Structures are given as C-alpha cells and as structure tokens.
Amino acid sequence: IADEWEHSTNERRMFRVIASLYAQLDLGEIYKPLKGLRYRLNFGPDFRYRRNGTFRDKESTSSQGQNHASNANNSNVSWTLDNLIYYNREFGQHSLGLTLLESATKYRKENASLAANGIPYEPSMWNALDKSQISQLADWSTDLVERQLLSYMVRLNYGFADKYLLTVSGRWDGASQLAEGHKWAFFPSAALGWNINQEDFLKDVNWISQLKLRRNAFGSDPSSRNPKTF
C-alpha cells in the first residue's frame, strides 16, 4: 500500500485585512448655537483571500496513474459605511435626544476552482494548469455572491425629570436579496420607560439602587434572507 503522505501535497494560504475606522466632529465646539450637535463617520472594511492547492502524483492510489492537481481561489470583500448625526439637549427637567443614521453595507464573494489530470511537470503542481500542458481537464467551477443593504434611521428620545422616558424610532431598509417590488420596508418601534427608583416614595429605600419598567413595540428585519447568487 502506497504511503499517501509521500505522494500528495496540500497547501492552504489565507490573507485578511480588517479595520474599524471613525471620525467625529462636535459642531457645537465650532459654532455655539449648534451646541449638542455632533457628526460621526464609521467605516469598517473587511478583505479576505484564500487559496487551496492540491497535488497528487501518479503513484497515489486516488490518481488512477496520472498526476492530478487542483487550485481553488476564494475572495471576500465587504464594507460598512455609517453616517450619524446626534443632537442632545436639556431644557430644565426635559431632555431631548435625536439620532439620524444613513448606513450602507456591501458584500461580494467570488470563488473559482480548477482541477486537471496528466500534469507533465510534477514540481509545478497546481501552478501551471495550462490547457496546452495537461491531458485532461477534470473539473472547474466559478461562483459569485453579492448583497447590498441600505438603511435610514430616525430615533427620538425624550425624558422628563429622569423618571419618564419615551423612545420612538423608524427605520427604512433596502436589501438587494429581496424580490423586486419588496426590496424596501419600514420598521417602526416605540418604547416607554419608567425609572421607579426616582420616585419620591422609593428615594429613601437604600436597598434598591435601580428599578426600571420598560415596554417595547417593534417590527422585524427581513434583510437576513439568503443573498443573491449568480
């Protein structure tokens, strides 16, 4: 029985670059009437490349008397870009917070693989899969997956005396993987909060540091559906 370890080679390589970048601008520091207004930019790129090369010489029990080689390449590129505007102010016992968001996400994955028999020059292994040099093309495939998501969001927070809280938001999501005519959807949400520990009848109760009652109502996000495959 031939030793397969001596007659086969498998090499995998991977390269990845991932980052999280942001920039922020306090407009109130530049122009006093805009106190409480801030702008923030978030950018998160992610790049991955993988290559898997396999070679089995003609002495391998699975090569059927021919040198066999395969080469598979995979690249993934994705990024997310967020534009955010914040506005926060207090007026006496009233507090107001406004958040505006525009977010774009893109994902792209490409796959390509090739396998052949009859490699004439063994040291080249999977690096010379030229149709003029090989005797038989055994297998090949290509694949492309893409998806995009674009979102807009508005959120309003209101508080009174640090006791009673209201949050109202609306989000518009557009997803490329959804069917034509159904790519965009609106998702509203609302929440009421009550900081009970701030009430006079609990202020002297030392063993309660925080007690909050919250009620939410919100929609769902369909953008997690399968991406489009070409």
Language-model features: locations:
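Surface-exposed loop/turn segments flanking beta-strands in extracellular/periplasmic regions
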Residues: 1-3, 54-69, 110-139, 229-230
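Residues on the lipid-exposed face of transmembrane beta-strands in outer-membrane beta-barrel proteins
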Residues: 19-27, 81-87, 100, 154-158, ...
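Outer-membrane beta-barrel transmembrane strand signature
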Residues: 1-28, 131-155, 159-161, 165-169
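Short loop/turn motifs that connect adjacent beta-strands in outer-membrane beta-barrel proteins
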Residues: 28-37, 90-96, 163, 197-211
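Membrane-embedded beta-strand positions of outer-membrane beta-barrel proteins
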Residues: 21, 39-43, 98-100, 168, ...
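Residues that define the transmembrane beta-barrel architecture of outer-membrane proteins
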Residues: 13-19, 77-81, 148-152, 182-188, ...
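Transmembrane beta-strands of outer-membrane beta-barrel pores
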Residues: 43-51, 102-108, 141, 170-176, ...
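Extracellular loop and loop/strand-boundary signature of outer-membrane beta-barrel proteins
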Residues: 4-10, 64-72, 138-142, 173-179
